Amino acid sequence: MAARTSQRTLARVASGCRPKSTTVTEARVRGSARNVRYLAPCGILMNRTLAPWASVLPKEICARTFFRITTPLVNKRKEYSERRIIGYSMQEMYDVVSGMEDYKHFVPWCKKSDILSRRSGYCKTRLEIGFPPVLERYTSIVTLVKPHLVKASCTDGKLFNHLETVWRFSPGLPGYPRTCTLDFSISFEFRSLLHSQLATLFFDEVVKQMVAAFERRACKLYGPETNIPRELMLHEIHHT
């Protein structure tokens, strides 16, 4: 009898010393809370439920969206050409255009204009142009063929990669000696993409004002232009 009692006592002691089964513990925990997992070795409760904000997140975050934005490339090179009959002689228009030291008095946005050097058929000029927020000086080499051609090419400056203006004067209408055919062209490329975009918006208006300014200058120096019959007038414009 004593022996049986001792065996039962030892069995109870042994069963009390056995570690609890992890799987049994997890099963009991799952039974009470399916969304909670108990890790027996470290005593941590892990919640299986997703955080509220996790359900509203997209499955795939488009981190590359910014780099996929495509904007149309702006052509930085702008070109404009114009042909027209003007009621002034070739010599008169040549004198107006070649008198670059006077540009500051009548050319829109021209703040300063100086002749740096001069020799037969050529001169070197420096112009300062300004219209908010741009204020820039640049130097040009000017080719002169009296009374037919005035061609100016920018040789330096931080504003332009390329700038060239060409004025050509040829005989006008038969029977109207105080007329000439004007061929004007300008091509330029800004260094700055921002300036190129602005030029795209205002380019046509700026060029028209420039050409009109030279006509007004001729009117101031030589009086009213020759009256040309409407049916004989010519005015062609091309730009890119």
Curated annotation (Swiss-Prot):
Give the molecular function GO annotations: ubiquinone binding
Query: Per its UniProt entry, which superkingdom is the organism in?
Result: Eukaryota
**Compartments where located:** Mitochondrion inner membrane
- Which keywords does this chain's UniProt record carry? Membrane, Mitochondrion, Mitochondrion inner membrane, Transit peptide
Q: How does it sit in the membrane?
A: Peripheral membrane protein
Q: Is Mitochondrion among this UniProt entry's keywords?
A: yes
Q: List, in alphabetical order, the GO biological process terms annotated in this UniProt record.
A: cellular respiration
| Assembly description | Interacts with coenzyme Q.
> What is this protein's record name?
Coenzyme Q-binding protein COQ10 homolog B, mitochondrial
Gene encoding the protein: Coq10b
